[in-house]
From Swiss-Prot:
NCBIfam families: PRK13666.1. This is UPF0358 protein Sca_0738. The lineage of its organism: Bacteria, Bacillati, Bacillota, Bacilli, Bacillales. Belongs to the UPF0358 family. It comes from the Bacteria.
Amino acid sequence: MAKTNSINNAAYDQLNKDADRILQLIKVQMDNLTLPQCPLYEEVLDTQMFGLQKEVDFAANLGLIDIEMGKEIMLRLEKELSKLHEAFTNV
């Protein structure tokens, strides 16, 4: 049972790391490359978010994480991205 919890924790940690990586990628892109209205920005964001959602779905389907935990990861990232987007568009 301890091994199962360890695997579940590892899956949750990895999903959080991936969410943080997306947030960092968008921060760098906004700081150095482009504005939020740019189609490239939208494409990168959509692709990354879609990929993370698929990871969350996969982990939930395997029983590695609870679906609610997955929703929390996605919601946290969406909130952070919204704050970041708002900060850059209100400059």
